[in-house]
From Swiss-Prot:
The modification N6-(pyridoxal phosphate)lysine is found at residue 213. GO terms for cellular component: cytosol. Homotetramer. This is Low-specificity L-threonine aldolase.
């Protein structure tokens, strides 16, 4: 057993997000003992350059750019894919770049967003794209042409099949449309499917990969693409206040996360599967399949009050919940996973006797917002 495995984490009962993962002792030691202290804005920090080079090897892309967050790597990545308005970005209606990045596409990219509801209820297909894309040369000047399609894999923990990605990629290349991937949890998709990060990335012009969520680094995301694209993205990074001077400490911890925590993601998938299977066994409806590390309860169908679920978890079961989404990570304890099951079941049994009527107050909370009403 390694030192990391023996370590007890303060996040053992944290189910709100995998962003709550904390650095391990070994990761912190790497950050402060093995980092260089060059200026990364001048591209003179050896550790950051080593991280970016490592990400190029993993993804198969020629260039990489270390950013402070996934929001930044997504937003500057999408902006760097665009040239001259008018233009639009097509994405899933639940996409993080659309709903949860503080309106970045409207401010930084000045882009119209075309959100699409997947016809299968889970992930965008080639047919969904084909039915919603706006062509640049079809003679209709009323709409903003689709210049970027942004996919997210995983989205709500759901894996987009590689066959769909391949077809969408071929379509984009044939129609001069750039294809971006919000791969914040692409690591999870790769671990679950056995498909390499490099193969996934080969179908995209740009990819954003988070180092903080499932991998547990304290900060950071990396944007990858070709060299010209990354040079352009670096301008937008600087413009957005994202230039980091002594980035070596953060980069060293990120390298440690890739080297030592990637193999632990399967544990987070196992925890989520346990919760998902438990829900199915007890007739608790889920919004989507549990492909990886996230479980989404269908609170409306179950007539459950998210506030009661959160409060019950806090006061009786010592678990931290955030309503419908249950996020699993490798720093959880099995006891806490079991407590989440008990908490969900008790909440369901209460609401079977006292059904909760949704008054709409929770509809604008994170991961409950529906921008396209049915």
């Amino acid at each position: 057993m390694t030192a990391d495995e023996e370590e007890t984490f303060t996040t053992f009962n944290e189910f709100r997000s995998d962003t709550f993962t904390v650095p391990t002792r070994a990761m912190v030691e790497d950050g402060f003992m093995n980092a260089t202290f060059g200026d990364s804005v001048y591209q003179e920090d050896e550790t950051t350059l080593r991280l970016e080079s490592k990400m190029c090897e993993i993804t198969g892309k020629p260039a990489a750019l270390f950013c402070v967050s996934g929001t930044m790597s997504n937003q500057i990545g999408l902006r760097a894919n665009l040239v001259q308005p008018p233009y639009s970005i097509l994405c899933d209606y639940r996409a993080h770049v659309f709903l949860h990045e503080a309106g970045g596409l409207a401010t930084l990219s000045q882009a119209m967003v075309h959100p699409v509801r997947p016809s299968n209820g889970n992930y965008l297909t080639f047919e969904d794209v084909l039915g919603n894309v706006t062509y640049d040369d079809d003679g209709d000047i009323h709409a903003a042409p689709t210049k970027v399609i942004s996919l997210e894999n995983t989205l709500h923990g759901i894996i987009i099949p590689i066959e769909e990605i391949r077809k969408i990629s071929e379509f984009c290349r044939e129609n001069d449309i750039r294809l971006h991937l919000d791969g914040a949890r692409l690591w999870n998709a790769s671990v679950a499917t056995g498909i390499s990060i490099k193969e996934y990335c080969s179908y995209f012009d740009s990819v954003s990969l988070c180092l903080s969520k499932s991998l547990g680094a304290p900060i950071g995301s990396v944007l990858v693409g070709d060299e010209k694209f990354i040079r352009k993205a670096n301008h937008f990074k600087k413009q957005s206040g994202g230039g980091i001077r002594q980035a070596g400490i953060m980069s060293a911890m990120a390298i440690h996360a890739i080297d030592y925590n990637l193999s632990k993601l399967e544990l987070s998938h196992n925890y989520a599967k346990q919760i998902g299977d438990f829900c199915q066994e007890h007739g608790i409806k889920l919004e989507s399949p549990v492909d990886t590390s996230l479980v989404f309860l269908d609170l409306k169908a179950n007539k459950m009050d998210p506030n009661r679920l959160v409060e019950l978890g806090r006061t009786k079961y010592n678990v931290k919940l955030m309503g419908q989404r249950i996020a699993c990570h490798f720093q959880l304890s099995q006891e806490s996973v079991d407590n989440v099951k008990k908490c969900i079941l008790e909440c369901l049994e209460y609401h079977q006797k006292h059904p909760h009527k949704d008054d709409g107050r929770n509809n604008k909370k994170m991961y409950s917002l529906d921008a396209i009403k049915k």
